[in-house]
Amino acid sequence: MIAVVQRVTKSSVEVDGKVVGEIRKGVNILLGVAEDDTEEDINKLVNKIVYLRMFEDEDKKMNYSLLDINGEALIISQFTLLANLKKGRRPSFEYAAKPDKAKALYEKFVEEFSKYVKVQTGIFGADMKVYILNDGPVTFILDSKQL
């Protein structure tokens, strides 16, 4: 499971021209589910992200977590994070979970994350427009297999 976590001042997602999710200060999470992912991967990522000290204190040091600042999360499913780009010029998605499995694990990730902070989401499988006002910019790429 791969998560691109961006510290944001605000972020929103639109589907068919309508805002379906919007947050203020917090994180935007683009989440890719791999074929071999399990609930253990969810637990590792959720625990890492909610406690990751990525928000600045008064001295401009990253000492505060999402929980410390009472931040929010916008979570977007993005299977393209699992693209294999080794051959040719067209990405292969052989490592991405099939839609049914990906949706189930994505929804479980959202459910677990919601136990800690306010969460908004996009719509799984929809064509979305994601607006991200990255703060810093501060961006982390986390792979659950490396945590």
From Swiss-Prot:
GO biological process: D-amino acid catabolic process
Gene3D superfamilies the UniProt entry points to: D-tyrosyl-tRNA(Tyr) deacylase (3.50.80.10)
Domain of life, per lineage: Bacteria
Cell compartment(s), UniProt: Cytoplasm
Motif (Gly-cisPro motif, important for rejection of L-amino acids): 136-137
Matching Pfam families: Tyr_Deacylase
Keywords: Cytoplasm, Hydrolase, RNA-binding, tRNA-binding
GO molecular-function terms, A-Z: D-tyrosyl-tRNA(Tyr) deacylase activity; Gly-tRNA(Ala) deacylase activity; Ser(Gly)-tRNA(Ala) hydrolase activity; tRNA binding
InterPro entries, alphabetized: Daa-tRNA_deacyls_DTD, DTD-like_sf
Chief place of localization: cytoplasm
Enzyme Commission number: 3.1.1.96
Transmembrane parts of this sequence: none
SUPFAM superfamilies: DTD-like
Catalyzed reactions: glycyl-tRNA(Ala) + H2O = tRNA(Ala) + glycine + H(+); a D-aminoacyl-tRNA + H2O = a tRNA + a D-alpha-amino acid + H(+)
Assembly: Homodimer.
Function (record text): An aminoacyl-tRNA editing enzyme that deacylates mischarged D-aminoacyl-tRNAs. Also deacylates mischarged glycyl-tRNA(Ala), protecting cells against glycine mischarging by AlaRS. Acts via tRNA-based rather than protein-based catalysis; rejects L-amino acids rather than detecting D-amino acids in the active site. By recycling D-aminoacyl-tRNA to D-amino acids and free tRNA molecules, this enzyme counteracts the toxicity associated with the formation of D-aminoacyl-tRNA entities in vivo and helps enforce protein L-homochirality.
Domain comment in the entry: A Gly-cisPro motif from one monomer fits into the active site of the other monomer to allow specific chiral rejection of L-amino acids.
Protein name: D-aminoacyl-tRNA deacylase
Gene: dtd
